[in-house]
């Protein structure tokens, strides 16, 4: 989740009293949470990065409620030049940039810096794919160069840390956090001005020379990265912030660019889609008029033009979340109002019957509850703790958050994370989960039973496993010693039923407990329910 904060009085002072109620109502349309305190807290799902700042959110709300038209504005050409050195192609090859000119940034400075960091975390994947530098153009002199420089060069960072770039990488907080994104080399990427002054060392830190202040009116924004599309997305998100704040955007002349090209950037803005009204009606379950579709899409920030039986829809560049017609229809329904969608009774063509697999899962659930355990549910998508030994083979290609970047391949790590989040509860903690995982590309349903107690060892889970199997299966079980990821060697093993492997059992290693911030002993067993059912039948 992405959180945006602003003092309520500051919001009212800048945008007027009506904007407060406007944003509160807009939450029901978009689907964000709005916490009404002295400091307003707005919490978003990660699917609308164009709204993750107060100026862009206010702009979208005004378009929706005041029917302010979207202008298909074109970027102007700037006389500023940026030369791209061939050396950066091996380190951080992609570059885009723009110039923004307008009023003094004033109180929006904090909004801008917060939005920059949000883009770093979301689109930029913690600066791995994209990093952004924002500079006061009046404090420097173009043309600029995106090139490489020696780590022995000296610089002064935006917060007055002074030393060699090597010092910055090793001692400055930003350097220590992000130096791993650069290859082990004697040179680093840098953006220099006409006189060789260092504007920034991407993706690490900006120099003090072009530090932005509330009085700044002219900005030069550099966007560098490892992924061309991500650089393009960040370009439009930042450009939208400035345009929402009444700034003019112009594009510098890029020499030697490795992409995205100027044409790629311009073509992404107001990209066209043909939306058939029958297609909309099929999703809505009711007939809609061309006028209705156009009105509601314009309220959601699209350019929509008649062309019966199709509507021509042009998607602004900052709507990086829109990947096809279904996304456009979803926005139409949000504007149309989900409460206005007519309910219909769909008569089933068959007679229902219980799913046998689900019935057996219920029996398993009853048995484990009877053994004194509480059921929990964790996310199928995960990522944070799968740095080693990941066997799922299913990763999200473009995750909104690295914490939800893979489909889990086991349950016990998720349960450890859950226990770590509930340390305030008294011991013992006896929990279980029945859930889907993917192992080596195959979907399986697992049962994981876990005990946290000051005396919990593998023998604890072994006795629980024995009791469980006796209540559910008459077949002979056996545990064969095996090293299990995250467990103590010699206190973990593989579970066999009638000679066939059905799961694993183990006592969690102290180092694993430490990684999760846990201190008490934990043991568990995890079995494949399908294998258990096959033995049961």
Swiss-Prot record:
Compartments in which it is found: Cytoplasm
A GO cellular component annotation in the UniProt record: phenylalanine-tRNA ligase complex
EC number(s) given by UniProt: 6.1.1.20
InterPro entries xrefs: aa-tRNA-synth_II/BPL/LPL, B3/B4_tRNA-bd, DNA-bd_dom_put_sf, Phe-tRNA-ligase_IIc_bsu, Phe-tRNA-synth_IIc_bsu_arc_euk, Phe-tRNA_synthase-like_B3/B4, Phe_tRNA_ligase_beta2_arc, PheRS_beta_core
Domain B5: from-to ranges: 268-343
Principal location listed in the UniProt entry: cytoplasm
PANTHER family reported for this sequence: PHENYLALANINE--TRNA LIGASE BETA SUBUNIT, PHENYLALANYL-TRNA SYNTHETASE BETA CHAIN AND LEUCINE-RICH REPEAT-CONTAINING PROTEIN 47
Family affiliation: Belongs to the phenylalanyl-tRNA synthetase beta subunit family. Type 2 subfamily.
UniProt-recorded name of the protein: Phenylalanine--tRNA ligase beta subunit
Species annotation: Thermoplasma volcanium (strain ATCC 51530 / DSM 4299 / JCM 9571 / NBRC 15438 / GSS1)
